[in-house]
């Protein structure tokens, strides 16, 4: 296993290519921007045999080999580093199904402006390989440079799409914008589509080789169902083989049990939120993602994340962290009234915080630890 502490570019793409064909070792892409303590913790937890940097290759004395092609280090937004082990077969099955669904062709160009240390960025590299082209790589996100890239397809997170729209960058330049990593506010999707963008929303995780459900419909070969506990379960050739050096196996009879709550209607999956984002307030269960989706439709709200915080009276209270639209402030009473018109009264937020932007992890998802622990 080679831990690649390298910026996005040809060396990293070539290492992924060799891992997929079996000509090279398994690769563990890591961001060179990781703080030193975080890098040390990740290497200690995942134990690669070699560490590759721009200065050379270093052999690790306690490294462990792997049968995987790609290992993605993921802690979500809450935990210690885990290594999601993905075989070449799983990665290629995902990429082929994605290209088929999108109608992508040989020779199509993909733009990589997400970190290859995350599955969304890594899969852009895999799709490029299958299209027979070199990925266009942007190590730093610039709306204007993205719009002018000349790529046919791009994978973005909602924050990046929001910045492109705010900058007036040409979102219609792409045949496809895959949008994932976090729930997209309905208003953002409507605005982007009105600007001529072909948006395809994706749902998945590192454990499913990235997005495996497009616009609510599973990719070919992927099956989705809801268990008795309300959690989404996924089966198919795209699944990971396990967590590196851990016995943890979140499977039930071949189905991967996710941490997401969902519902299926007419064959279309709706993700309601994370099971660990259920807020227990006064004995009532509130799904934070459902409340956030409702509040996102308020005309004064540009972006919102809903979290639970400890409270001596209620156990937990529902807190809306809001980025206001333009300069208009939005009050707690406004948001509570808006929510109570659409949800049970107990689900309405009991506190609101106005912020200039939502704190994000490197993969574009909200930093839930920071949001839950804000003073």
Provide a role label for each language-model segment.
Residues 1, 36-40, 46-68, 94-95:
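Flexible, low-complexity linker/hinge segments
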Residues 2-46, 82-85, 134-140:
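Short beta-strand->loop structural element characteristic of the AMP-binding/adenylate-forming
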Residues 7-8, 58-73, 80, 103-109:
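Conserved pre-ATP/AMP-binding loop-to-beta segment of ANL
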Residues 236, 261-347:
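AMP-binding/adenylate-forming catalytic core of the ANL superfamily
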Residues 344-365:
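AMP-binding/adenylate-forming catalytic domain of the ANL superfamily
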Residues 218, 227-254, 274, 286:
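Conserved ATP/PPi-binding loop(s) of AMP-dependent carboxylate-activating enzymes
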Residues 44-52, 85-164, 176, 200:
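AMP-binding/adenylate-forming
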Residues 164-218, 223-225:
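Gly/Ser/Thr-rich phosphate-binding loop
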């Amino acid at each position: 296993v080679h831990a690649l502490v390298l910026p996005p570019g040809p060396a990293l793409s070539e290492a992924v290519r060799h891992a997929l064909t079996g000509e090279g070792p398994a690769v563990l892409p890591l961001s060179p921007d990781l703080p030193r303590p975080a890098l040390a913790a990740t290497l200690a937890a995942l134990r690669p045999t070699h560490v590759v940097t721009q200065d050379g290759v270093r052999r690790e004395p306690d490294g462990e080999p792997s049968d995987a092609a790609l290992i993605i280090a993921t802690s979500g937004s809450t935990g210690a580093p885990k290594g999601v082990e993905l075989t070449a077969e799983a990665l290629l099955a995902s990429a082929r199904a994605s290209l088929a669904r999108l109608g992508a062709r040989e020779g199509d160009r993909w733009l990589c402006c997400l970190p290859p240390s995350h599955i969304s960025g890594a899969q852009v590299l895999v799709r490029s390989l299958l299209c027979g082209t070199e990925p266009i790589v942007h190590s730093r996100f610039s709306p204007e440079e993205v719009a002018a890239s000349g790529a046919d397809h791009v994978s973005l997170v909602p924050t990046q799409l929001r910045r492109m729209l705010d900058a007036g960058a040409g979102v219609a330049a792409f045949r496809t914008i895959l949008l994932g990593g976090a729930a997209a506010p309905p208003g953002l999707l409507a605005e982007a589509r009105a600007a001529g963008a072909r948006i395809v929303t994706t749902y998945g995780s590192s454990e499913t080789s990235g997005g495996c459900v497009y616009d609510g419909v599973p990719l070919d070969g992927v099956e989705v169902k809801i268990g008795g506990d309300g959690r989404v379960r996924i089966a198919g050739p795209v699944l990971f083989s396990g967590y590196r050096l851990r016995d943890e196996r979140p499977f039930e009879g071949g189905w991967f049990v996710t941490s997401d709550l969902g519902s299926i209607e007419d064959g279309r999956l709706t993700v309601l939120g994370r099971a660990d984002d259920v807020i227990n307030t006064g004995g009532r269960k509130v799904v934070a993602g459902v409340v956030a989706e409702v509040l996102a439709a308020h005309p004064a709200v540009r972006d919102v994340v809903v979290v639970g915080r400890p409270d001596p009276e209620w156990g937990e209270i529902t807190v809306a962290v809001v980025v206001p639209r333009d300069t208009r402030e939005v009050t707690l009473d406004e948001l509570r009234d808006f929510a109570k018109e659409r949800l049970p009264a107990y689900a309405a937020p009991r506190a609101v915080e106005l912020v200039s932007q939502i704190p994000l992890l490197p993969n574009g998802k909200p930093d839930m630890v920071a949001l839950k622990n804000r003073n």
